[in-house]
Structure formats: C-alpha cells, structure tokens
Amino acid sequence: MSRPSTPLLDKAPTPDRLRALPEQDLPQLAEELRTELIDAVSTTGGHLGAGLGVVELTVALHHVFNTPYDRIIWDVGHQAYPHKILTGRRDRIRTLRQAGGLSGFTKRAESEYDPFGAAHSSTSISAGLGMAVASELSGEKRNVIAVIGDGSMSAGMAYEAMNNAGALDARLIVILNDNDMSIAPPTGAMSAYLARLVSGRTYRSVREAAKQVAQKLPKFLQDKARKSEEYARAFFTGGTLFEELGFYYVGPIDGHNLDHLLPVLKNVRDTQKGPVLIHVVTQKGKGYAPAEAAADKYHGVNKFDVITGKQAKPPANVPSYTKIFGTSLIEEARHDDKIVAVTAAMPTGTGLDLFGEAFPKRVFDVGIAEQHAVTFAAGLASEGYKPFCAIYSTFLQRGYDQVVHDVSIQNLPVRFPIDRAGLVGADGPTHAGSFDTGFLAALPGFVVMAASDEAELRHMVRTAAEYDEGPISFRYPRGDGVGVDLPERGSVLEIGKGRIVREGTKVALLSFGTRLQECLAAAEELGAAGLSTTVADARFAKPLDHDLIRRLAREHEVLVMVEEGAVGGFGSHVLQFLATDGLLDRGLKVRALTLPDIYQDHGKPDAMYAEAGLDRTGIVRTVFAALHRDELGHEALPTPFRA
C-alpha cells in the first residue's frame, strides 16, 4: 500500500527546515503531518487521538521557538508523535513501540529534542520550572515550554509546580492543552483578538506602568485598581485561578487555528518576565473522523484500517485478568454493601467501569490523583467500608507515602488490586509493574498476594473482601488469562498459605504470580531430563508460607524462586527466611529468578521475559547450572588438571 503524498513534510525533516518555511505553508504542512501520523499509527498501534489534537500546536511551537535550544516538554508523552515526526525521527516512526524502535513517549536518550522523558502524568511543569531556573542561573536566554493536558491538571503536582513558579517569578511558558473543553471553550474571533492583545508587549508594558502609578496611591485604591483589572481580564478571558498562582493568563484560543496560535506564541516568546499560561483548546482525534466520533476508543489503538477506522483485535478465547477482577468484584459487592471501589482516572483500564455500571453510587473516580485516592480509601476504611483502591502497579508508586503513612501505620483494611503487574510490553520501563512486591512486602502487617491464573484472581478478590485485619494487596498482569476453569464465586484463601501443584523429589520451583505456567512447562522438560520436579504456587509474599518453604528446602536438592518483579521482592524474602531458619546450612542450592536490575526497553512481553530468564528455557537453564549440567542436561565433566 502506497504512503500518502507529503511534499511539504518531505522538505521539513527537522525544525530548522520547518522554520525556513513561510507561514502561509504551515496549514498544509499540518495537514500532511496529520496524514502521516494516521498512516504510521495504523501500522504500529499506539496513542493516536492526543497526537491528532496537537498537530497545529506542534507545528507552531517548532516554527516559533528555536528548538532544541529552547526546551519543549510534553506532559505524559501520548501527544508527542507529531513532535517525533518533525524532529528527525520520521524515518523510524513506523517502529513506534516495537522492539528496538522508537519509544511511545518522549525519551532523553532518543533525541536532543526530548529534553525530559515522560510517561506518567503531570510532571512537565515541575521539570520545566527546574530547567527555567537552571537557564537563569546559567545566564541563558532560552525559552522553556511545558505542554500539559487538562486531564493532567487534575493532579496536585501540577499545582504545586505552578505555585512555586509564581513565587519564583520564573520565566516559564505553560501551554494548557484543553482537549475536553472541560475548563472553558474558545469564544471565536473576540477570544483570539483578546489573546493577541493581552499577550503583546504593548499591553503588558502599559499594565506594568499602571502598576507603578498605582503603587503611589493609597492602599485601598491600589487594591481596587488591581481587582478591577483582574476582574476585567477574567470576565473576557477566564484564568483567575492561574493568575492567583502567579501566572499571566492568555486565552482561551483555538488550538487548530495557526493564525491564532502563531502571534500569541511570538508575543509570549518575546516577553522577558514571569511565568505565562496559554490556554489552548483542541479536539482529540482532530482531522480523522473515526477518532473524532469516538475519542475514548482512539486514545490508544491497535493497528487499524485507515479507510474504515476498524481496529485489528486478536480474538480473545479467554477473558482478561482486568475483566475477571471487575466481574469478581461485582459478585462480591452483591453480597456485601460495604464494598466500594476507587480509581485514579483509570476506570476502564482497571475494570471498574464494569463495577460502575452495576453500582454507580459505589465507585469513585478521583482523577489523576493517586496520593488522594489512597488516603480517600483509607478514610472510607476508617468508617467501616471496604474500599478496593484499584491502581496500576506503576502508578501506585506515586502514592507510596500515603500507603505507608495513611494506610499501613494505621493498619486500615484498604484493598489494593494491582493491575499491570510485571512487564507490559510496548509501553516499556515507565509502565512496567516491577516494584510493588518489594515496596509493599517491606511494610509490617501488609498482606501481599499474587494471582497465578484467573481462578486464583477470583479467589483473591473474595479473600480481600473478607479480610478486615489490615491492608491487603493482590497483583495480576495485563492481558488474557490462561484458560483455566472459573468458579462462579471465589473461595476465601487461608492467609499465608501456598499450594503444591505438582509433586517431585529433586528440584523445587516456587512461583509467585503468573510465571507458574512457565514453571510447569519447565518441570516437564526437567522431568524428561531425569530431574523430578515439584512446582508450588506461593500465593503470598507476605506472610510467607513457612511450612511450605521448609518442606521444599528439606526435601529437594535445588530450590528456585520465580517472580515477575525486581530484586528485593518475593525471592529476597524467601532467602531471608531460609537463612534465618538455618535451611541454607545443609548445602541446599538456591536460586532467585527476578526481573533484571535494569530498566528493560519496550518490546513484546514474551521476548522480554525470555531476556530476563523467566520463561521455560531460562528456568531450565538455571536448574541445570545449579546442578553443574550443560545445556542438554548432561553432567559437566571436570576440567582436567594440566601441570
């Protein structure tokens, strides 16, 4: 299939070439960029809607500002695909999120045009402020621009940064990309005119002169003059909140109209003082009818047909872990009206959209605010409710102090369903669920579980619902289950007790999480090599099943712990117990298989687990090495001594 014709885009592979184009060519360039983006993402999948919404803004920014000397920071990074195309990466744009290809987010190691990496929300203003202050300290004259969506503005970190920027009076430009029209819609030509007016030097010079005059007036007249000016500007343009934080507010303006964007950006670029916020209103999915009609479905997409918009989805023979969690929680909530659910802006991603349909008054979406979500859940628990605070593993990191201080220390029974545990593939290291076992199992009194399959997940939902002695968590991966039979309702598991799923005599494989299937496959191969193998499902990283571990250690020559987490997690806790209990004193060969002590780049999950040695082959190889056997399982002969 031939690619679309893009003559202007072909002439502007980098921002310096883009800046050489006349302004009248920029609308056509934007259309070609949009066409290229749609075609590229149709072949790779990825985040489409947000990028389509900032095409004109991206063109305008790189045309007005001297990148990469001037810094542009894209919050989250979902909207950065057009930026990548315009900054020398067009030839690799069809490798997005593929192994060895471009990251789906901004990444410092990838390009000098990515001054700050991102993937989690609401970091851009803080990073931009740090860069702006560094520029001032160095005597530089560079511009620093942070582009942040209205969704990301729901996080407290954004306001902390703005409050600090206003106090420092730093020269920082924040562009609020309002793509849900959730703050204020543009008001047409009058809005554009006012935006140009108030962003210009003349207006700001007159304003500063008026302030100087006002300072000579009595205090009560100074206050009246200030309030009158603020009221007049707020009446026409909005932005009172941002002004109170110390920002000079400009907008709202149409983010798809280059005639509106360019003069405002130039005016702000040429301003030499203080933080400025430009309120730009855009439309997610702009210029592609299917994405405009269903923005939620085109936020993140699989490969799709450009003509029809139909996404290619592999047939699912079994339900996803996320869906199993959602349906299991609904079942428990039917039996217990104290069960409530909390999500931090991820109802669909966590399966709580299903719960919300069944119990709309018992689900709470608190926005991108994981810290608040955790403490809000703690408050619910303190009043006798049973909150399930469902957060991705990678995002739970953002609320860890609240987990410790507000939940764990007070021993409040908050339930933490932890989705996206382990590796997540195309989203790479920023979204990998590597650390939750380590940082939760370190907390006194915290119950930490991991589901080995979808039936176990159903049991753990029931167990968490019934457990009122303190905080409890259960982790599960992205993707579909393994196809085991599901009970109609989960059973209550005995806290701190695992299970034997295969009996053997020589080797013991102790799995925590969904690597259990790989352990069973490895046991088959080891058995074929004459090594009788036990496979156990730990279920709990805390409290550990001491009786099970003692049995495995005493009755086997080799013990291998396997988990989908970083060093310092389940395996470390088992080793600590083995050492303390004296179980290492008799020559037991122990190995702990974890994710490697690196941030693994994006790729296919199966390939990434193989790289980590957490697949069947890696487990078998580890056992053979412990027993001094070669890759075929034969006992290695000692190297002959030579004088």
Curated annotation (Swiss-Prot):
It catalyses: D-glyceraldehyde 3-phosphate + pyruvate + H(+) = 1-deoxy-D-xylulose 5-phosphate + CO2. Binds 1 Mg(2+) ion per subunit. Keywords: Isoprene biosynthesis, Magnesium, Metal-binding, Thiamine biosynthesis, Thiamine pyrophosphate, Transferase. Pfam families: DXP_synthase_N, Transket_pyr, Transketolase_C. Its cofactor is Mg(2+); thiamine diphosphate. The keyword Nuclease does not apply. Pathway: Metabolic intermediate biosynthesis; 1-deoxy-D-xylulose 5-phosphate biosynthesis; 1-deoxy-D-xylulose 5-phosphate from D-glyceraldehyde 3-phosphate and pyruvate: step 1/1. InterPro entries: Dxylulose-5-P_synthase, THDP-binding, Transketo_C/PFOR_II, Transketolase-like_Pyr-bd, Transketolase_BS, Transketolase_C, Transketolase_CS. It is an enzyme of class 2 (transferase). One of its GO terms (molecular function) is 1-deoxy-D-xylulose-5-phosphate synthase activity. Homodimer. Catalyzes the acyloin condensation reaction between C atoms 2 and 3 of pyruvate and glyceraldehyde 3-phosphate to yield 1-deoxy-D-xylulose-5-phosphate (DXP). Belongs to the transketolase family. DXPS subfamily. This is 1-deoxy-D-xylulose-5-phosphate synthase. It comes from Brucella canis (strain ATCC 23365 / NCTC 10854 / RM-666). The gene is dxs.
